[in-house]
């Protein structure tokens, strides 16, 4: 049948099972929005306050559901406003499809009004991108974009469609979309045998879990693997929830703000089994001294991650779910009683701790955990509050911590929380932000209010850019350059002005009451938590130091006393 480009686009989205799109209209994309209007009962559109919010919402939707997130933007500044969100998704391997419309084909390359080369701009931050200049190519391009976004190592794909293409007609034949095969090559069984042999020989194995285990939906296989190996487990920020944070073998996060137990344990292990992690600098500390006593065995879907940041001894390339299932079939039951006992002693000796008297970031996280019974989707911005959330909320399920781990995007959380709630409406969704991050995209409070999306926005408000100030305090002679937010911004009044409910908390009791209110409010709520600007994230690894030199507040005080 003959359809115009806008009709073909909407039909192809329906083929892919798309039920929600986040975006912002404009002149170049008007044909698409006109067609979307006719299908509003099948595809709901969430009008964000800014295109960056739309890209983050698509990202949050994808992380929470495991499906592809979709965002729309018009040409020029509409398209460029998506860039930060696309880059965020790219760094964390999140499948989104960003659809932009450009000026008509005859106007391309002529500096036309709102013309921009968005495919050129996004080439380094997309898995693939397309500009469709012929309507006859549109349907196959959209189908290909969704396949690329989901297969192999996931990632964002951009499709740029000139306006005249959305109006031109072509033959459209609907197709039934087949399930995506994530990894099409067979796993090398010789590599599997080597992996099993290394595990059997190890006396002090340690499992390190990254976001790849979540992207592969491999939590069940991971738990079975750990049961077989019988060894301690740590994770990266992106791996939170892949392995239950309440399990006896779990030791916490690894790296710069990881637990001493994880950092010391990995440093003393003789085999580090890496499951879907990329060895970022935030994990390894000094890479030349990382896990220096251990052989390293890496499981990953992307061969490019092998020997990229850390030299490994053996690797198995493949979908994590399939790799673990195959290893589990071949691996005999292991036992490492003495090694586990030593790690448990570390856990008892080096617990996470914070000042118990006042309203602090860690208390806020623990109270959220208590009231949500560990069953919420937690979204964070970037900074101290992000680390506190990773440390003090015990994540037991995958896709329950949504955070910008690679790009470290301030302003990510509120849009992502909206996307997560639209994808998982049955879940409590909480976005935790610092006051600096909240300012970046707080206009999305109006979006949540417009659609009465019941997300809870917790602002951990210390009136400074906390993480940067912490570094200035420890490593820059307490010279607080541009990190003190001396102003009179009232987040409660701002939230109320945008149509949300809001409350301020200055004590523990006030926060507990405020969060209880937010859980039952039936709409968006902003909680402004006033905490001390001197609160810090502990433990910490100094820049350039090995993770075996992780220190906390007590260590720092003892060092200052001896000096």
Question: What annotation goes with each model-predicted range?
Answer:
Residues 1-331, 367, 371-374, 454-457, ...:
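N-terminal alpha/beta PP-like core and its mobile active-site loop of ThDP/TPP-dependent enzymes
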Residues 6-10, 14-19, 27, 32-37, ...:
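Active-site diphosphate/adenylate-binding microenvironment
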Residues 10, 86, 142, 416-417, ...:
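Generic hydrophobic/aromatic pocket-lining and core-packing "Φ" positions
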Residues 24-26, 45-56, 71-78, 133-134, ...:
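Active-site nucleophile and cofactor-binding loops and adjacent substrate-binding regions
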Residues 114, 450-543:
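Thiamine diphosphate
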Residues 136, 293-384, 508-512, 517, ...:
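Phosphate/pyrophosphate-binding active-site segments
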Residues 296, 368, 380, 419, ...:
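Hydrophobic, well-ordered secondary-structure elements that form the walls
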Residues 412, 416-454, 460:
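Catalytic phosphate/nucleotide-handling subdomain of diverse soluble enzymes
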